């Protein structure tokens, strides 16, 4: 029996490239043995609703084609359900942090090859209050860069748009009082920003979590304490090399459950999109989603080798 795949795509991502190549993508998947259909999103929340519908219709595979925001919506559509379909990823956004972490090719046909080859691995996701995320949650003015950067600037200079906007915001940054409880420990004090990471790639910084594991059941918690502009610039430089973890203003920990609160009205960034405001409870859901990934990911330190699943297409 042929497997059924549903593509959920953002038609505006990647300068509408996927929309143009959709017919070829459908043909490629059909030749590989999939009965395939596609759905184009029109507004925020569409990908979540369509993922839920596809689950009810018992699709074997869901393919998210778009940026990290589209992927986040698809994950939110399936995370609470039993017998979740496998997830395929076609990175079409500006940064594509999750795709980077799993070494998924940025070209459409290369990403489809990963799905067709059939190798998959289970990865952790995070639950924040009543929603889910697959890459990161963060707070602090600098973390607002990804959803405050103009779309036109992103289309012109790509990922560099975030750095341009980030440097523009640096002088405005202010520390806020935070209480962060994590696995029996407590941080209480002034901080500029915090990150909860599930992968090694956040906002294009591929060494922000140098010891990341995608399936170990732990968040990486990074807290940047109150710092002056020179100190913050130094931390960012170190972060580009994965050398920030020992900086005296950086707290770097692993935790399964985290609670964050503040008297300040602090916005949250979840997978690159606006995620509401504090307070927030975070829980790591270990190996919760089964994702297609290149076979060589088994040789990477990001994945525990004894967890890797080799699930090939049944012809």
From Swiss-Prot:
Residues holding ATP: 10-14, 41, 67-73, 94
Residues the entry annotates as binding Mg(2+): 213, 216, 218
Keyword Magnesium: yes
GO cellular component, one term: plasma membrane
Cofactor, free-text remark: Binds 1 Mg(2+) ion per subunit. This ion appears to have a structural role and is required for catalytic activity.
Keywords (A to Z) from UniProt: ATP-binding, Kinase, Lipid biosynthesis, Lipid metabolism, Magnesium, Metal-binding, Nucleotide-binding, Phospholipid biosynthesis, Phospholipid metabolism, Transferase
UniProt domain DAGKc: residue ranges: 1-132
SUPFAM superfamilies documented for this protein: NAD kinase/diacylglycerol kinase-like
Gene Ontology biological-process entries: phospholipid biosynthetic process
Active site: 273 (proton acceptor)
Source superkingdom: Bacteria
Gene Ontology molecular function terms on file: ATP binding; ATP-dependent diacylglycerol kinase activity; identical protein binding; metal ion binding
Co-factor(s): Mg(2+)
Cross-referenced InterPro entries: ATP-NAD_kinase_N, Diacylglycerol/lipid_kinase, Diacylglycerol_kinase_cat_dom, Lipid_Phosphate_FormReg, NAD/diacylglycerol_kinase_sf, YegS/DAGK_C
Catalytic activity, as annotated: a 1,2-diacyl-sn-glycerol + ATP = a 1,2-diacyl-sn-glycero-3-phosphate + ADP + H(+)
Effect of residue 96 to A: Loss of activity
EC number: 2.7.1.107
Entry's family note: Belongs to the diacylglycerol/lipid kinase family.
Function: Catalyzes the phosphorylation of diacylglycerol (DAG) into phosphatidic acid. Is a key enzyme involved in the production of lipoteichoic acid by reintroducing DAG formed from the breakdown of membrane phospholipids into the phosphatidylglycerol biosynthetic pathway.
Assembly information from the UniProt record: Homodimer.
Protein name as annotated: Diacylglycerol kinase
